Amino acid sequence: MRTFIAIDVNEEVKKQASEIIEKLMKRGFGATWVSEENMHLTLFFLGEVDEQKISEIAEHLCRRVRGFPSFSFTVKGFGYFKRKMSPRVFWLGVENTDRLMKLYEELRNELSHHGFSFEEKFVPHITIGRVKYYPDKWEKLIEDIDFPPIEVAVDRFKIYSSTLTPTGPIYKVLYECQFEGGLIRYA
């Protein structure tokens, strides 16, 4: 099954993100927009992993971060990744904190023991849309879009499965790892 590890964002972030999506749609942008219930900060995309292995990975990851201190990060700003001269992905910025990087590094180190490698630099962000089409002079149309700073408290991460459908992905929580509470299985 397709799997990824993520941190959920709060309702305030989801509401503000939906308002930005609405603006972009009204301005002529077409995208596969991320629904509020699917908004998250991806830590790792693991790809296809069988159920037995993901269970083992979840246990090891959770053990690795048991007692990790709770922390927060700030979602702030709006941006995009480009392909050539075209917008490819719209995102909300995440201010990188030492604790977020430490969590990422702990999980990455544990995942490396399970055969995963991640060469790309970690650029924390929250994807809100994968752009399909855009209007002429699109850069001018997004100059005024911004995202006010919103703090997100973190005391856990989740492991999700992702099923691709023609109407967009369906995410299902498989495991939740609470820093102080241990592993919860949903599968």
UniProtKB/Swiss-Prot annotation:
Q: Which GO terms describe its cellular component?
A: cytosol
Motif stretch (HXTX 1): 40-43
Q: Which reaction does it catalyse?
A: a 3'-end 2',3'-cyclophospho-ribonucleotide-RNA + H2O = a 3'-end 2'-phospho-ribonucleotide-RNA + H(+)
Q: Where is this motif: HXTX 2?
A: 125-128
Tell me the HAMAP family matching this sequence: RNA_CPDase
Give the record's family classification.
Belongs to the 2H phosphoesterase superfamily. ThpR family.
Q: What is this protein called?
A: RNA 2',3'-cyclic phosphodiesterase
Q: What is the lineage of its organism?
A: Bacteria, Thermotogati, Thermotogota, Thermotogae, Thermotogales
